[in-house]
Structure formats: structure tokens, C-alpha cells
């Protein structure tokens, strides 16, 4: 009898935790961040022609998503988990310019043709909460 009361009390506490956690506000959003990008250019023989780098402002997904744990008689652990992660909903492609370009000897290019390099990258345009591990979307 005492064990049964303890189990019921535990499940009530667990239910309270699940309900209070799942009612929290989701705040998955697109946030600007700085990353260091390096791109190398090679000729047909595989020799390095130039190496360019720069700090680039890009979007990333950041925030919290509601996740839940439910008691379950069918699960071996006794609980069913539903986890959600903040991930990209849409990606957009854009060009960025790298402004620090060097020859294979490490000497910085001064001529306009070699001093800059355009690089195409993809970044999140919009973020959303998705079931963790679900890559089918």
C-alpha cells in the first residue's frame, strides 16, 4: 500500500513537472552571429593559387523548444519522451566577399582581381521547433 501511494505521488509530481515545462514559452529564432570563413582556390593540378579569409555576419538558429516526458506503460523505461529542437525552416543562399587574400607564400594580394573573393554560403532564413532527430522535412 505504501509503495502504491509513493508511485502515485511520484506520477503526480512528474505530471506537474511535464505540464509546467510544456507551458513554457518557445523562443526559437534567427540570430545574427560572426564566423571566420576561409576559402582556398586551387589550379587544375591541385596547386594553391590563393587563400582568402574574413569575418562574416551570418544567421543561426537559437532558442528553446518545448519538450515533454509522459509516463508510459508501453515504454521499457516507463516514460515516453517528446524532444523538440530549434532548427532552420528555410535556408537562403547569398554571396559574401572575403577581403584578406594571400598568395601561397603568405603575401597579401594588392591587385583588385586577386585581393577579393566572393563565396556563396547558405544560412537560416527562418527557424522553427522540430522533433529532434527528424531529418525527413
Curated annotation (Swiss-Prot):
InterPro entries: Bursicon_suB, Cystine-knot_cytokine. It is found in: Secreted. PANTHER family: PARTNER OF BURSICON (PTHR41151:SF1). Residues 28-123 form the CTCK domain. Its main location: secreted. One of its GO terms (molecular function) is neuropeptide hormone activity. It comes from the Eukaryota. Keywords: Disulfide bond, Hormone, Secreted, Signal. Final heterodimeric neurohormone released at the end of the molting cycle, involved in the sclerotization (tanning) of the insect cuticle, melanization and wing spreading. The keyword Nucleus does not apply. Coiled coil: none annotated. Residues 1-24 form the signal peptide. This is Partner of bursicon. Heterodimer of burs and pburs. The gene is pburs. GO terms for biological process: G protein-coupled receptor signaling pathway. Gene3D superfamilies: Cystine-knot cytokines. It comes from Bombyx mori.
